[in-house]
Every structure is written in C-alpha cells, then in structure tokens.
Amino acid sequence: MRHGDISSSPDTVGVAVVNYKMPRLHTKNEVLENCRNIAKVIGGVKQGLPGLDLIIFPEYSTHGIMYDRQEMFDTAASVPGEETAIFAEACKKNKVWGVFSLTGEKHEQAKKNPYNTLILVNDKGEIVQKYRKILPWCPIECWYPGDKTYVVDGPKGLKVSLIICDDGNYPEIWRDCAMRGAELIVRCQGYMYPAKEQQIAIVKAMAWANQCYVAVANATGFDGVYSYFGHSSIIGFDGHTLGECGEEENGLQYAQLSVQQIRDARKYDQSQNQLFKLLHRGYSGVFASGDGDKGVAECPFEFYKTWVNDPKKAQENVEKITRPSVGVAACPVGDLPTK
C-alpha cells in the first residue's frame, strides 16, 4: 500500500477517487453531455497520473438527482446504452478501468421504478460488473432494490466488489463481499450533511473488520436541495487512510494498492484475521480441549438464523423493537403509510 506517487507497478493497482461536483440535470441530452465531461476527466487524470489503473466516480455523478419523478423515468438508462458507450470508449482510449453511476437504470418492467446502478468497465471498454443498490436510502430514495452482490477480477487480478452509499451503513454487505473474496470494496456515494463524520468513520472500520481495501467516491457541492461533503478516500486493509479529499469540488485522491500484500495478510495474519476466525471460532480452546483443529463453524447468531430460515418472522421481530409501519406519522414522507 503506497500513497504519494503518480505510478503503479506490476503488483500495485493505481486507484483514483473523484470528488465529482453533484450535477443538477433534467433531460437526456444534459445527461449525455455530462457523460462526455466525465470522459474528459478520465483523460486528464490519466495524463496526470500515468500509473492510473482504476478511476471511480460518485453515486449520482452521471444523472444527478432527478427530484421530478417523470424526469427520473425519462432519463433512465439502459445497460448497455448511450451513457455506457461513452464511458466504455473513454476507458478503452485511456487504458483504464472505471466505476460509473447510473441513476437510474430502467427496470425490466417498464412501470416499476428504476434501479440505482453501478457499472465496472475494464480497459477494453467491456462492462464486467453491474451492481444494483440493495439498500436504497429510504424513505427518500425510491429506487427498486437490487438483490445481490458481485465479485469480479479487476485490474491486475485484484478482486473487486461494488456497493452504493447507504449500503455501506450495513455491516452485512461488507462481510458478504469480503467472504466472497473481494479485496477492494468500492463504495460510490452521494452523501450529504449532516452524516459526514459517521460516513468517514464507518469505511475505516469496515476495511479493518473485513481485511479489505476500500475506495470511496463521494459527491461535492450544493444541488439546490442537499449539500454534499465530499471526503472521497482510499483506505488500506488495516483501516488506515491512504488518501482523503476535503470538500473541494472535483478534487481527487490516488493510491497504489498491493495485490500481494492483502493476500499475504489474509493468509498469514492471526490475531486480527477476522474472516478466518469467524468461521473457526475459538480454535485455540477447541484444539486444547482435544476437539479438533478447526474451531466451531456453526453460526451462533440467532438473528441471522431466523432471517435465512424465516424472513417474515425476522421482519416481525424487528418491528417489535422498532415500528410496524414504513411511514412515521410524526414526520410523514410522501404518501408512505403510517399505520
């Protein structure tokens, strides 16, 4: 893990995160013009950082937030489509990989709300991962939720998963990606005040807890509704910050992520190897007791057992300690039911 140079090496993946200014757009033509601007940014960053292998843009950086429902449907993208073609050409031309936001992606059933989607494009211009946000930011966001995470081989073989904004507030998604082999978890977000300190803290904690690199790209600026705090960052698998932007519009950070170092740590670390220890619980004591050398593999957590085996029961249980309705009468949002 290195920070401060403009290079990369056969073992290191050069990663840049962009504090992209939140656009305020209304039409398809405006969206496509913004895509072309993003393509220009890629070319400029590659010129300045010749070691760049992967560039990451925030959630909503392509479309902005369409506060008008009809505009949201009118500007929703197909994958592949006109927007992705612009990104693909930029990645191919500059020989870099890129992560791009589509808010939204058309639902397969035209009348249903679009998805909030990220795509990972390789340096040949091919879409190698399409991730749909599993946990939209309710009650404000009205995206149709996705249903799974993905892990793919990224630049130089580094294994990459994509997550989006509010997804990252749930430890389960980080653990799912890491347990499936992700070595870099990319979190693209359009996060606004007042949650700045919490969001800076959680990505460090999740990198540490899951022995994984984390790259965060967040929006900046004011779109007339929300003020976005930036602080795009790159975190090492030991939870230390390698590079972090401030609140500057269109700033960026860059670091080199070693493929070998993270694999070495996951293989040889002992006291802080959370991934191994979770599925080999108490192995020291179990071995000393003569009960084998694998520890305990069974899940000890009642909530997770219930969730997997009886999701409706788990939902009912959480309503007992929170509330039974999606809406809140004391502070209604839209037409969400409060009873």
Curated annotation (Swiss-Prot):
Domain CN hydrolase spans what residues?
A: 13-259
Induction details: Repressed by iron via the binding of the Fur protein to the amiE promoter.
Q: Name one GO molecular function term.
A: hydrolase activity, acting on carbon-nitrogen (but not peptide) bonds, in linear amides
Might you give the EC number(s) for this enzyme? 3.5.1.4
Record note on temperature dependence: Optimum temperature is 55 degrees Celsius.
Q: Which InterPro entries match?
A: Aliph_Amidase/BUP, Aliphatic_amidase, C-N_Hydrolase, C-N_Hydrolase_sf
Q: Which domain of life is it from?
A: Bacteria
* Active-site annotation: E59 (proton acceptor), K133 (proton donor), C165 (nucleophile)
The record makes one more remark, namely: Asp-167 is probably not involved in the catalytic mechanism, but is probably involved instead in maintenance of the structural integrity of the amidase.
* The protein's name: Aliphatic amidase
Q: Which organism is it from?
A: Helicobacter pylori (strain ATCC 700392 / 26695) (Campylobacter pylori)
Q: Lineage in the entry?
A: Bacteria, Pseudomonadati, Campylobacterota, Epsilonproteobacteria, Campylobacterales
